[in-house]
A protein has these predicted regions:
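Glycine-rich beta-to-alpha active-site loop
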Residues: 101-145, 168, 172, 177, ...
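Contiguous mid-protein beta-loop-alpha structural module that forms a pocket-lining wall or clamp
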Residues: 152-210
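Amphipathic alpha-helical blocks and their helix-capping loop/short-beta junctions
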Residues: 185, 191-268
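Long, low-complexity C-terminal extensions of enzymes
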Residues: 249-264, 269-348
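Hydrophobic/aromatic residues within transmembrane alpha-helices
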Residues: 57, 70, 123-124, 180, ...
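Short, flexible helix-coil linker/hinge segments at the edges of structured domains or between repeats
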Residues: 83-87, 131-160, 200-204
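Conserved CoA-thioester-binding segment of acyl-CoA-metabolizing enzymes
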Residues: 1-58, 99
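Glycine- (often His-adjacent) and acidic-residue-rich active-site loop
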Residues: 59-93
Length: 348
């Protein structure tokens, strides 16, 4: 059986597999509100369907699983109350979907090929079996558009080793296979997702009592070791600098090092929105031990406050629309972003 919308497709097999395919390859499968609504409805239906035992989650095309939310549409929120309310509804629904996927009662195999960023990470971070390849490019890149790592990012980035989560949140660095495994953002590395998907689809799940264990066995038979990554070797440098209690102190510490790591990363931070840096830094510290649900609830509050302020629209315009890379922020320096302003982003 196959159900199709223009942007996401759902199908089932006689072997007990439900398949979700994000279907906007020209937009790197970035998700729209229609897609989110459709997935919520279908996943709730499958949850109560005894004929469906395993979910496979993938993106169409060769370039990516999902590049995130449809940010250009969200950027229209400044045009009026209707657009603003539509943006809020998107966030509410998206975060509900993220929580449903993370708490789903059946195993979900996420095939993370190519670009997996932002909202794409949020969709799959809590799923039971996250599979990556040599082509996977993973990031929480929201800092690049004067936003913050939403979709529960503060929750799962805080679970990474040492201060790697803070590092990735503030720098928006893109990481590859070994580093994705290192921070706990994937479970298996395989050479060929097509072979794995075919094995899953061909296996008869209708007679299996513990599908999770059988999936571990099946995927494990194809698992490989990825090329060496970078984060483990940088762990001491990251912990030496990104543990500090203000963004200004982090930048100063990086500058004081007088080495390539310090210079590179000080410049990276100073290229970001000062508001985004400070709000994200505080959020990472204050919510380090909060649940995913608590974090997603706060994400709605923080996201809407970003949409009430101009710097987000400047960031989107500079990076995604006009692409001149020179945003004219209302708060262009860290010193201009005081604690009162930062605190206001956490108030509904």
């Amino acid at each position: 059986m196959t159900t199709t919308t223009t942007e996401v497709t759902f199908s089932t097999t006689t072997t007990g597999v439900g398949i979700i395919t994000l279907n906007r390859p020209k937009a790197l499968n970035s998700i729209t509100n229609n897609m989110v609504t459709a997935m919520l409805q279908q996943l709730k239906q499958w949850q109560n369907d005894k004929a469906t035992s395993v979910i496979v989650f993938k993106g169409s095309g060769e370039k990516g699983f999902c590049a995130g939310g449809d940010i250009k549409t969200l950027a229209s929120a400044k045009e009026g109350d209707e657009q603003f309310n539509n943006a809020k509804q998107f966030f509410v629904d998206e975060y509900e979907l993220d929580l449903l996927l993370a708490n789903y009662s059946k195993p979900i195999v996420s095939l993370l090929n190519g670009v997996v960023m932002g909202g794409g990470v949020g969709l799959t971070q809590g799923t039971s079996h996250r599979i990556i390849t040599q082509n996977t490019k993973w990031a929480m890149p929201e800092m690049n558009i004067a936003f913050f790592p939403d979709v529960g990012g503060v929750h799962f980035l805080n679970q990474a080793p040492g201060y790697t989560g803070m590092y990735l949140a503030l720098t928006a660095k893109t990481i590859r296979a070994a580093d994705i495994l290192y921070i706990g953002a994937a479970d298996f590395y395989v050479e060929d997702l097509r072979v794995l998907e075919q094995k899953i689809v061909d296996y008869d799940w209708t007679t299996v009592e513990e599908a999770d264990h059988k999936l571990d066995e099946l995927i494990g038979s194809l698992a490989a070791v990825p090329p060496r990554g970078e984060l483990a070797a940088l762990q001491n440098d990251i912990d030496d600098t990104f543990h500090l209690y203000s963004v200004e102190d982090i930048v100063a510490k990086l500058r004081d090092r007088g080495d390539a790591f310090g210079d590179e990363h000080a410049n990276i931070l100073l290229s970001k929105s000062p508001v985004s840096l400070k709000v994200t830094h505080k959020y990472m510290l204050d919510y380090a031990h909060r649940s995913l649900e608590d974090t997603l609830n706060m994400d709605v509050v923080v996201a809407m406050n970003f949409l009430r302020n101009n710097d987000f629209y400047e960031g989107v315009d500079a990076v995604l629309i006009k692409k001149h890379q020179s945003p004219n922020y209302d708060y262009p320096t860290l010193e201009e972003v005081d604690d009162e302003l930062v605190d206001s982003y956490f108030k509904a």
